[in-house]
């Protein structure tokens, strides 16, 4: 049988946190340091209990040194808890740059931070602690142990600043972000990227094709707007038009193809070889894609492919 090894400090912190939450215990006085209990937990038991189940907290030790790694030398604070604060309290008086510098003292070599200096978040005074809950989520239990943020709630974190985009997620056609199948970080690198919207790929199309591989091509007959930018026709975050289109068909098609079938008024019927006069032959609704179905590109021979028809 495999033997497991427990972390006494971790078990103690979790136990104290539960006791405090139930009203069965109160933080021990400072003199309890002599008993070897975690120093910071004597006053901050609830915070330590939440912190203990994060990735940072897995390095918790009985001396409280892990706390000083971020908050700085706490000697003066221990001597006078009410009158002296640690050097770094991460409050409003501390600049975003100063907060981030503390995190970078350990995470500076992280490859995800390679473009942090050129990213929009840094330029807009966003600090690591604005997005990451360093002490853990105390209001809700962590879905996966040792994570400082929860993937399920990621869109809510981003939505605190990006409110207009958060609203688009409630539209009838949207990426399954609310359903938990797609996360903001699947497309964007919040720590910085070379692209304007901090997308993970070099271009919007490269990003979209990473999932929608059937639209990549190459095709014998290409639809040039598709090759240029998927966002020419689609709104990536949400739309009230099916398939995330920016506007309805045929208006969307007419933005470029204004002269196509110009002899027919909108809503009128027109003859289609071998077809009856029904909704399939009316110049409205899905009329364009009833015939031109291969709008992302076609490998059909001769002129059928040229016009992207099925």
Q: What are the residue ranges of the model-derived segments?
A:
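Intrinsically disordered, low-complexity proline-rich regions
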Residues: 1, 15-18, 56-59
